[in-house]
Amino acid sequence: MLEAECDEVELTSRDVGDYLMFKTRITDNFTGDLTLNINTSNLIKFKTCSFFICYGDDKDRYELGWTSTSTSRSIFQHYKDGKYIRDFRIQDPFPILSGSTFPVVISKIIANRVAFRMSRRLNNVIVDKLKNNIIEFLFVVYLDVDTGKIKPNTILKNLDLSSLFIVFSNNGNNKINLPYEIELQTKDRGIVYTKMGNPISYNLFNKFEDLLDIETKGVDKPEDKPKPVFDDKGKQPTDTVPPVDNGKPDISKPGEKQGDIDIASKFNNIVMAKLKAQSSSDPLTKKQCDQLMLSLIKWFEKFGITKDNARLLIFQFGISFSTSKENLNNITNNIVVENDKGGFVKILKIDYLNKLYGSIPESHTHNLERVLLRHYAQEILILLRSKVLEWPRKLARNKGIFEQYAYMACDFFDTAELELTEAETTALTTVKSWTMNHYKKKRQIVNSSQLE
């Protein structure tokens, strides 16, 4: 067991960096759909990290995920018999935006086939079902390997695991309780520390530190530091570091690395990026959206509109008049709704938008209406299917969507994050293919001289 004697640990120069690996077995027998939502706003705090969702075992598996070194890349690759298949590898560089999410989807389809999809980067790559029907999730963060000192617990204290990723099953209705394994690699000592954990729900803990209980032994004991001085207002300085919780001893043992993925050996001289606080221009969190929704409902109640109708009205404004910024200043868009006294009230969308933006004290560069509705997109989709909400038929005609699927024309829908039926996916794919071919023909004609 390691002893906690100081806050910092001395590192020496070496070829391969230290890393922290978190691995969890999602299922031993994959039989349905699985969606893994990655919160990339937390991942971009680190200069180098990787996540993969793996289908199969250590001998034969497909790996779908994302890695960030000098550039961010989505990767889909096949690992078999101790090596990666060279003719089966898909890479796609792309920028990671603050506050964005990155869905990874695996679907079981008929005839023993499995389909992979990754947000807007990879669309339905179909492979044969493997003999070992196992799904695992792998997350790796690389630590500082420069000579000097680092604070090993800083990365653990600042990484919120519950907001890093959320696993959904059964069409997003249930969270999964998963067993986990954590591996801390320290090459300078030639030791690998591992810890196994019992199944736990991700909403029961917040930090990696709550799982690890890892205490790091330092080379030299630091001098006693003076206590922080409080200002006149009694506030503690922001640069003070919270104490390390040295509660339970670590269950540690030396041994070789688990599995065949040796990601750390591919990188040299990796430096952990400085952590940054979330800026005021980031999109809203789920908690902020729920609070904002309650505030808007109370505003509608002043007009005698019930809570249920107010919620539907918020959804209908975005559906009927779209959420594009071009419509923000339209003073004619309105909905007439019945109040609790049997009368009718005319609500202008511009008044609703003024209330929406006025409810947020910080300034935002994002389209707040679109961000808000995307948090409730799955609920809205169900209401549209049931025809509780009016369909955007005009927008559907402009997009060329079939009449029976006109409800899919909402401009705030991110179809990569929705649970769609096969028919809905086919309808949208047909429209997308037609649009791409239509504009491809236009791009082939540069000027009128080409027609001669």
Curated annotation (Swiss-Prot):
Keyword Transmembrane among record annotations: no
Cited function: Minor capsid protein that encapsidates the 5'-terminal portion of the viral genome.
Name recorded for this polypeptide: Minor capsid protein
Keywords: Capsid protein, Virion
Signal peptide: none
Localization annotation: Virion
InterPro entries assigned: Closter_coat
Biased composition (Basic and acidic residues): 219-236, 247-258
Domain of life: Viruses
Annotated region described as Disordered, given as residue ranges: 219-258
GO CC list: viral capsid
Keyword hit for Secreted: no
Family membership noted in the UniProt record: Belongs to the closteroviridae minor capsid protein family.
